[in-house]
C-alpha cells in the first residue's frame, strides 16, 4: 500500500513510518525538518503542510496519517487547516482505505492552551466529516 504520513522526522510520525516500512509498504513523509529515515521504500518531502503549492504529485494513497502538529502561535493553521488541506488533496479519492488523525485529549477536555485545544477539537469534528465523505469508498476515518 501507499501510505502518506505527515510529521515523520520524529515521534509518532517516525514510529508510524518505520512500522509501515517494516511491513512492506511504500511510505511518503512530509515534514518541515530533514528526513531521519533511511529506507529504499521511503520518500521524504521537506515542506510545510500549510503550503499547498508545495504538495508533490504522488500516486493514489491507501492510507493517510495526519500527524504533523505544533503547540505554538500556528496551532490552528498547522494542526487544523494543514490537516484539512492534506486530507482533501490526498485522501478524498476512490483508492483510500483509511485516514487517521492524531488528536489530543485536549480536543475533548480543553487545556491551558486554548488555541491548541481548539485546533485539536476541530480535528475531532473534521474526523467525523471525513468519515462520511470517504464512506462510499468503503474507507474509514478515525482520530487517535
Stretch-by-stretch model annotation:
Residues 87-88, 128:
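A short, exposed helix-loop element centered on a Lys and neighboring polar residues
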Residues 40-51:
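Rossmann-fold cofactor-recognition segment
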Residues 9, 17:
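N-terminal Rossmann NAD(P)H-binding glycine-rich loop of SDR-like oxidoreductase domains
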Residues 67-71:
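Conserved NAD(P)H cofactor-binding loop of Rossmann-fold oxidoreductase domains
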Residues 98-122, 127-136:
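Catalytic loop of short-chain dehydrogenase/reductase
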Residues 23-37:
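Conserved glycine-rich Rossmann-like NAD(P)H-binding loop of the short-chain dehydrogenase/reductase
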Residues 134-144:
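Conserved Rossmann-fold SDR core element
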